[in-house]
Amino acid sequence: MNPRSYLIAFVLVLSTACQEPLAVRPGSGNWMSGQRVAGPGGVSEITVMTQNLYVGADVDLVIRALGTPDPGDDFPALQFAIETVGKTDFPARVQAIAAEIARRGPHAVGLQEVSRINIDLRPLGVPLVVDQDFLALLQAALAERGLNYQVAATSDNINVSLVGGLVRLVDHDALLVDASRVTVNAASGQAFSVNLGQVAPGVTLIRGWVFARTTIDGRAVTFASAHPEANLAGAPVGLLEQIRAAQVGEMVARVGGGDERVVLMGDLNDVEGSPMYAVLAGAGYTDTWRAMHPGTEGLTCCHRADLSDQVGSFDQRIDYVWTRGFARDNGTIQGSIDRFGAVPADRLTGPAYAIWPSDHAGLVAVLR
């Protein structure tokens, strides 16, 4: 993306951030009104999990190669990414993630980088075919464990089509709920209004979020999960920070206020002290990790792209569980929040070496 395009995107961010929240009409694509049940008592404990599934390779390397004037580096970068996808073996990793869901039993699971990868290089004389649907693989792994997690909502995000369509990647966000315990009253997935858009030939960066208004044991709980824009080599950091703040601000405005319990989770791609963080804190949300683990870093990102590091090499905390409406009268949040995929014992057997379940740690929070 050239400097002029970044400037246009920045103006769009500012204009969106300054607008009043849009009124949403019943029947529109973003209609989020659901029955709000305020039964007596209420559920004593709600468990949630957020996990970036990880596409399996460093896609930024491919984007950077496509963005250079030298076409000679495009295919080597793509070939390296495909080889890395094989080494990071999502069909094996999904078993570990499904096992963690089975062990912890969350009411809702927010998922990011839920990828659909379709590669067929046989027309080029290369005997390589990859066909992976991350969501279908996860649902199958959960069903094998006797679990009934249903897809409440998905959003369509990054879309990549290369080599004349022989290489395709579509990225989604998804929200799963345990259908045996959670009633979904309304749900939706949508793209954010502000996005980077096309950043290289065949590569369009769109980010989105998903939500569900639910009833659990007679009490209303809203779950939302998001994956705002990530840092991208060559893009101004300040612009990306403002894009993330605008994206999260849009989500907060459309979830709405009130006394209803809300859990907002995901790979939010920014750290404490960022504009994104300020938007959530200013809207009355509580950073659950910080509330329950004051003074503890709780880093969540990132393992090496090939997942080969023997000890976690995290250097930032960008995965979160934020809550509203769960605080006690004294302002405290009761429960627990832990990481998954952060210690060597979480690794599993890969095709060539031990690998991590994802390049991000997952979070599991129990809210009382």
What are these regions (language model features)?
Residues 19-36, 181-188, 253-263, 268-368:
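Metal-dependent phosphoester-hydrolase catalytic domains
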Residues 14-17:
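C-terminal motif of bacterial Sec signal peptides marking the signal peptidase cleavage site
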Residues 1-7:
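Bacterial N-terminal signal peptides that target proteins for export
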